Regions:
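Flexible, active-site-adjacent loop/turn segments at secondary-structure boundaries
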Residues: 26, 31, 61, 112-113
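Conserved nucleotide-sensing/catalytic segment adjacent to the nucleotide-binding pocket
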Residues: 1-53
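Catalytic cores of transferase enzymes with a strong primary signal for eukaryotic protein kinases
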Residues: 23-28, 40-41, 45-46, 94-102, ...
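A structural signal for well-ordered alpha-helical scaffolds and beta->alpha junctions
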Residues: 5-13, 104, 117, 121
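NTP-dependent small-molecule kinase module
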Residues: 65, 69, 86-90, 112-148
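A glycine- and Lys/Arg-enriched "phosphate-lid" helix/loop adjacent to the NTP-binding pocket
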Residues: 3, 69-115
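ATP-dependent NMP and nucleoside kinases share a basic, alpha-helical "lid"
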Residues: 37-88
Length: 148
């Protein structure tokens, strides 16, 4: 329950987004959070003009009818791995550098299996490059209408 096997938490995302759609607000605590000592909840106040659900699983097939727009950020695997390991090491999120590398290799193996089965980019309305492309200023991004 957001501590389940990678990308097998679609039922939680469906439950949260369904509640948000029907009631206009959300205060959701994934069932596993208290068991793992995680406090708080995922809260969206009534009247929020939009909600961003972030992550590689945010556009999964199971929620396609519950989201209005899907944006796919296309990034080279090596660049994503390097950024993730650097960020997690700097923040201490997944331990030291060695533990972060181990986590990221585990994560990327699960992510690749999810991508092969679900192909979320095929439902994307907009594709954004996750890498700086030649000729763009620092405040510019490259994008195209989806799907890929």
């Amino acid at each position: 329950d957001w501590n389940e096997p990678l990308f097998r938490w679609d039922h939680l995302l469906v439950a949260a987004l369904s509640e948000l759609r029907s009631s206009g607000s959300l205060d959701f605590t994934p069932p596993a959070w208290p068991r793992h000592g995680r406090k708080g909840s995922i809260a969206v106040a009534a009247g929020a003009p939009f909600v961003v659900v972030e992550g590689t699983g945010a556009g999964m097939r199971a929620v396609a009818d519950l989201i209005d727009v899907c944006i796919w950020v296309q990034t080279d695997d090596d660049a994503a791995e390097e950024r993730g390991i650097r960020r997690d090491t700097e923040e201490g999120t997944n331990g030291d550098a060695e533990e972060s590398v181990r986590f990221w290799h585990w994560w990327m193996a699960g992510e690749r299996a999810f991508f092969a089965a679900d192909r979320p980019w095929e439902r994307a309305h907009l594709i954004v490059s996750g890498e700086r492309l030649p000729g763009l200023a620092d405040n510019e991004i490259a994008w195209a209408e989806g799907p890929i």
